[in-house]
């Protein structure tokens, strides 16, 4: 096998994985929309975060890895949890009670643009080029075409909810930048650690605010978890 052939196959595999990731990420908004139909936003996100965190802990154990125990790193996990799960997940779930899943996907696709802007302001050592700006704008336009530009028809009718999704997107951008501080760790560790911290915040909030034992969620909402 030539080096060029191997490189082409690697690129194809990476593009396939990227496509799968984009599909799963986009579908998550549909699942959230189904979930909040009968489950309050905080409880829905608490359950999803608990499930995701538990799965990652199992993966860690399966790989023979353990989470770090230092106080400093867990404070960083906690901060990352607020940026990457607690605040944005809850905002999106709350907003999707009135915003269509397609429009939520499009609004969230602005995350690379906010990452670009925040990087330009706070991470001065990275070059900001027209090529990068073109890339993120082209990516957002591509998502609009995939989801369907008709989803933009609801833009402006539920402004507060839509702004909540944009705020969540800015949180994701901040999380992407802050996540670079975990370079010394295996990527699964900050993911698992931050989800566990998010669970520790969201589950008590759910118990206090929603009293989930009194809820009667639909089968569709439960499956959306």
Model-derived regions: residue spans:
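Loop-to-transmembrane-helix transition segments
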Residues: 13-23, 58-61, 65-93, 108, ...
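Specific alpha-helical transmembrane segments that line the substrate/conduction pathway
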Residues: 43-54, 83-84, 89-130, 168
């Amino acid at each position: 096998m030539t080096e060029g052939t191997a490189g082409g196959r690697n690129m194809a595999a990476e593009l396939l994985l990227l496509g799968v990731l984009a599909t799963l990420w986009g579908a998550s908004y549909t699942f959230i929309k189904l979930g909040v139909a009968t489950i309050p936003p905080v409880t829905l996100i608490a359950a999803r975060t608990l499930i995701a965190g538990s799965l990652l802990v199992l993966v860690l154990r399966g790989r023979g890895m353990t989470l770090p125990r230092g106080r400093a790193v867990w404070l960083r996990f906690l901060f990352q949890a607020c940026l990457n799960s607690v605040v944005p997940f809850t905002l999106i779930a709350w907003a999707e009670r009135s915003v269509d899943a397609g429009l939520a996907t499009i609004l969230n696709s602005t995350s690379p643009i906010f990452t670009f802007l925040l990087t330009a302001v706070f991470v001065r050592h990275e070059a900001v080029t027209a090529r990068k700006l073109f890339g993120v704008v082209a990516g957002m336009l591509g998502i609009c075409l995939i989801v369907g530009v008709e989803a933009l028809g609801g833009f402006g009718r539920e402004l507060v909810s839509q702004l909540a999704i944009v705020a969540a997107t800015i949180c994701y951008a901040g999380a992407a930048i802050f996540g670079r501080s975990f370079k010394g760790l295996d990527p699964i560790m900050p993911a698992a650690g931050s989800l566990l911290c998010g669970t520790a915040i969201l589950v008590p909030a759910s118990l206090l605010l929603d009293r989930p034992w009194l809820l009667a969620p639909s089968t569709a909402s439960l499956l959306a978890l």
